[in-house]
């Protein structure tokens, strides 16, 4: 009997963990640390390091796994590994004065790769953007510059922004822009919105020449399976399209968690055709991004109170897409 297919899953490991050596389920490794590296394909596994924290004792490796025979390669700067059912890839936009063209090239490369290899369901993306709140060479904020490039890639390939999955767009302390993703060959992929927050690609132009494009969460399950993964986008203290509780990290953290709870709850999942529901206690492998180091203890306390004691939580000290946001939270529900 053929074993059932399971959706990709994540583990947080210590840097250099020996138990990753020879792991045939390993699809990709992203190291979060106090420096960055280039994208590589080591022993059939895409790897890179992103500069997402300022203390080495907060560093860790984000390891993505999937069952099944694996092969790997590279295509137009994207290092990738795949099983018969899932594809993981990593690419980098080099550091520079402008990012739109480089971002457009990376994303068109990703879209072409998933089409060529036959994994059309893009299920999750991450984008770590160096100097995210700083001006580019033309005076445009780097995050907005990035959003222009991503939107241009969608335009070039005729992709509806509403089909884009859960995503993270967060700061890094150097290294250009690192993009990585998960895509599926088949199965169910359901993108979800938050009824209390405006759909990202409908944000008004005050947030930039082109809006961000992502869903608030994405459900991914193998063909014919009842179980799967719910990928929760990096989620902030936003209601409608407005940042709330300016300068109050505790209140913003609470709203972030409330937004996650609303997205993953039974009422919202039912609205998107899924007969299931989750609570904050079901969210695991969370990454919590905090702008100011002095706020980390407050954020840790609130997360400890609201999340499961069994949850794996990594806190990273880095900038956030809007200058008035102090914290963002992402996670996975399995």
Curated annotation (Swiss-Prot):
Q: Which reaction does it catalyse?
A: chorismate + H2O = (3R,4R)-3,4-dihydroxy-3,4-dihydrobenzoate + pyruvate
Describe the disruption phenotype: Cells lacking this gene are unable to produce rapamycin.
State the organism's lineage: Bacteria, Bacillati, Actinomycetota, Actinomycetes, Kitasatosporales
What Enzyme Commission number does this protein have? 3.3.2.13
Gene, per the UniProt record: rapK
Q: Do you know which NCBIfam families this protein is assigned to? A: chori_FkbO_Hyg5
Keyword Hydrolase among UniProt keywords: yes
For this protein, what is any one GO molecular function term? ether hydrolase activity
Quaternary organization: Monomer.
Query: What family does the Swiss-Prot or TrEMBL record give for this protein?
Result: Belongs to the FkbO/Hyg5 family.
The residues annotated as the active site are: 328 (proton acceptor)
The entry's protein name is Chorismatase
Q: Which UniProt keywords apply?
A: Hydrolase
Role noted for this protein: Involved in the biosynthesis of the macrocyclic amino acid-linked polyketides rapamycin which is a potent immunosuppressant that prevents T-cell proliferation through initial binding to the immunophilin FKBP12. Catalyzes the hydrolysis of chorismate via a 1,4-conjugate elimination of water to yield (4R,5R)-4,5-dihydroxycyclohexa-1,5-dienecarboxylic acid (DCDC).
CDD domains linked to this entry:
YjgF_YER057c_UK114_like_5
Q: Does the keyword 4Fe-4S apply?
A: no
Sites binding substrate sit at 143, 150, 203, 216
User: Which SUPFAM superfamilies would you find in this protein's record?
Assistant: YjgF-like (SSF55298)
Protein's organism:
Streptomyces rapamycinicus (strain ATCC 29253 / DSM 41530 / NRRL 5491 / AYB-994) (Streptomyces hygroscopicus (strain ATCC 29253))
């Amino acid at each position: 009997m053929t074993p059932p297919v399971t959706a990709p899953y994540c583990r947080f490991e210590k840097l250099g963990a020996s138990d990753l050596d020879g792991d045939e389920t390993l699809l990709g490794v992203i190291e979060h640390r106090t420096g960055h590296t280039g994208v590589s394909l080591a022993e059939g596994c895409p790897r890179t390091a992103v500069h997402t924290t300022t203390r080495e004792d907060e560093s860790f490796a984000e390891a993505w796994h999937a069952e099944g025979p694996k092969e790997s390669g590279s295509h137009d700067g994207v290092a990738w590994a795949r099983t018969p059912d899932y594809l993981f890839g990593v690419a980098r936009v080099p550091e520079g004065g402008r990012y739109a063209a480089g971002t457009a090239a990376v994303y068109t490369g990703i879209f072409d790769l998933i089409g060529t290899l036959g994994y059309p369901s893009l299920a999750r993306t991450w984008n770590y953007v160096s100097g995210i709140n700083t001006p580019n060479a033309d005076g445009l904020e780097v995050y907005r510059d990035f959003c222009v490039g991503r939107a241009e890639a969608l335009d070039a390939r005729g992709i509806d922004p509403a089909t884009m999955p859960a995503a993270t767009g967060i700061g890094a302390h150097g290294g250009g822009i690192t993009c990585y993703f998960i895509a599926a060959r088949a199965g169910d992929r359901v993108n979800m919105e938050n009824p209390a927050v405006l759909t990202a690609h409908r944000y008004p132009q005050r947030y930039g020449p082109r809006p961000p494009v992502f869903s608030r969460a994405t459900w991914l399950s193998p063909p014919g399976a009842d179980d799967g993964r719910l990928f929760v986008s990096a989620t902030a203290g936003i209601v409608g399209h407005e940042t709330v509780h300016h300068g109050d990290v505790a209140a913003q953290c609470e709203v972030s968690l409330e937004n996650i709870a609303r997205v993953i709850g039974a009422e919202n999942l039912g609205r998107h055709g899924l007969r299931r529901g989750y609570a904050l206690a079901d969210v695991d492998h969370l990454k919590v991004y905090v702008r100011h180091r002095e706020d980390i203890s407050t954020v840790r306390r609130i997360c400890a109170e609201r999340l499961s004691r069994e949850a794996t939580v990594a806190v990273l000290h880095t900038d956030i897409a809007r200058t008035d946001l102090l914290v963002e939270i992402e996670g996975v529900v399995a």
